[in-house]
Amino acid sequence: MMITLRKLPLAVAVAAGVMSAQAMAVDFHGYARSGIGWTGSGGEQQCFQTTGAQSKYRLGNECETYAELKLGQEVWKEGDKSFYFDTNVAYSVAQKNDWEATDPAFREANVQGKNLIEWLPGSTIWAGKRFYQRHDVHMIDFYYWDISGPGAGLENIDVGFGKLSLAATRSSEAGGSSSFASNNIYDYTNETANDVFDVRLAQMEINPGGTLELGVDYGRANLRDNYRLVDGASKDGWLFTAEHTQSVLKGFNKFVVQYATDSMTSQGKGLSQGSGVAFDNEKFAYNINNNGHMLRILDHGAISMGDNWDMMYVGMYQDINWDNDNGTKWWTVGIRPMYKWTPIMSTVMEIGYDNVESQRTGDKNNQYKITLAQQWQAGDSIWSRPAIRVFATYAKWDEKWGYDYTGSSSTNPYYGKAVSADFNGGSFGRGDSDEWTFGAQMEIWW
């Protein structure tokens, strides 16, 4: 008994050590931004985005507190085989008060199994909700290829000249389908499940320092038996993507061409949309009706120009042509140079211009925005974070058209009808004006 009692503290200590080691093995990653800002004409900070544009230049132009908190752990490993569990919870509030309650968005919960298939070494099987191989332009927070959502797939299959990945994900729309008619009136209140099937061939070395990635995405509305969609709804569509990545000036340049049809044109990033509807108080249905096509040509990157200068840049042309004439032509160009005074202090400027033409009216909206920021960051790269910055932003815009949401409860552009600024004696768009803001912000990823 004495021997047993003497061994007990040792066993407890060993168990505690094992539990501590396991706890330390948990990976904690994430992203967050928050700050405070003011508008020159009074009130809290305003943010500036051109009507019809799908993004905005973000430096000194973000008006919310946003965070993604990721916890993950390799839960099993034997040789080169392993299972990894990953999660991600996101929050967003208006940063107007101390206590701002919000419902979290459960964005990721998946398991990834590596090297589980003997005859496909290096490949990964996965299932669950996941940020899946997302492609974006950081300086305008624009995701141009992103099929994230609940799904499953097999990725990084070595085919000799590149890596092949296969995936299926889902993005449901609120409303859009109906099971039966009462008095010959269909009530399209049932949500519609949209499936996306994705095939990618990446890491193809085609020139010194350059790689090519090709992808095909097919999206479709997946209706329940005996259900129907709103007449004219976009039921399916395709997205084709080609992206060339070139190593240059201690950074990279990405040149992208994308072409989409019908349901894949609304967001233009690989998620199928076009079956959902919005309702007013009388439950009248407004169909998205986005049959048509989209062409996008994009060039963006980040480079180092000597010891003291870094720069991000973007140039993009996007043409969405819809059968209902509610499409747009959008082109944008911008730069973000950074001068490094010390390894942890820099001055950053961002200059961006947007121009959006309405397919229906032929009118154009345009805006340019300039931000100057003094920044302290953890390192001497334009990608170094965390960063604390103080900024001043000036924006000037001239908008000749806007969206008319008469009869619709939604303010999604795809439910609104593009009209000239003075349509029916109204005032649509933001008119011709300018404004400036100033404030401070932190940004971090880890």
UniProtKB/Swiss-Prot annotation:
<feature type="site" description="Important in sugar transport">
    <location>
        <position position="143"/>
    </location>
</feature>
<keyword id="KW-0762">Sugar transport</keyword>
<dbReference type="Pfam" id="PF02264">
    <property type="entry name" value="LamB"/>
</dbReference>
<protein>
    <recommendedName>
        <fullName>Maltoporin</fullName>
    </recommendedName>
</protein>
<keyword id="KW-1134">Transmembrane beta strand</keyword>
<dbReference type="GO" id="GO:0006811">
    <property type="term" value="P:monoatomic ion transport"/>
</dbReference>
<keyword id="KW-0472">Membrane</keyword>
<dbReference type="InterPro" id="IPR036998">
    <property type="entry name" value="Porin_LamB_sf"/>
</dbReference>
<feature type="site" description="Greasy slide, important in sugar transport">
    <location>
        <position position="66"/>
    </location>
</feature>
<keyword id="KW-0626">Porin</keyword>
<comment type="subunit">
    <text>Homotrimer formed of three 18-stranded antiparallel beta-barrels, containing three independent channels.</text>
</comment>
<feature type="site" description="Greasy slide, important in sugar transport">
    <location>
        <position position="31"/>
    </location>
</feature>
<keyword id="KW-0812">Transmembrane</keyword>
<feature type="site" description="Greasy slide, important in sugar transport">
    <location>
        <position position="445"/>
    </location>
</feature>
<dbReference type="GO" id="GO:0009279">
    <property type="term" value="C:cell outer membrane"/>
</dbReference>
<keyword id="KW-0732">Signal</keyword>
<feature type="site" description="Greasy slide, important in sugar transport">
    <location>
        <position position="383"/>
    </location>
</feature>
<dbReference type="InterPro" id="IPR003192">
    <property type="entry name" value="Porin_LamB"/>
</dbReference>
<keyword id="KW-0406">Ion transport</keyword>
<feature type="site" description="Greasy slide, important in sugar transport">
    <location>
        <position position="99"/>
    </location>
</feature>
<comment type="similarity">
    <text>Belongs to the porin LamB (TC 1.B.3) family.</text>
</comment>
<dbReference type="GO" id="GO:0046930">
    <property type="term" value="C:pore complex"/>
</dbReference>
<keyword id="KW-0813">Transport</keyword>
<dbReference type="GO" id="GO:0015481">
    <property type="term" value="F:maltose transporting porin activity"/>
</dbReference>
<dbReference type="InterPro" id="IPR050286">
    <property type="entry name" value="G_neg_Bact_CarbUptk_Porin"/>
</dbReference>
<comment type="function">
    <text>Involved in the transport of maltose and maltodextrins.</text>
</comment>
<dbReference type="GO" id="GO:0042958">
    <property type="term" value="F:maltodextrin transmembrane transporter activity"/>
</dbReference>
<feature type="signal peptide">
    <location>
        <begin position="1"/>
        <end position="25"/>
    </location>
</feature>
<feature type="site" description="Greasy slide, important in sugar transport">
    <location>
        <position position="252"/>
    </location>
</feature>
<dbReference type="InterPro" id="IPR023738">
    <property type="entry name" value="Maltoporin"/>
</dbReference>
<keyword id="KW-0998">Cell outer membrane</keyword>
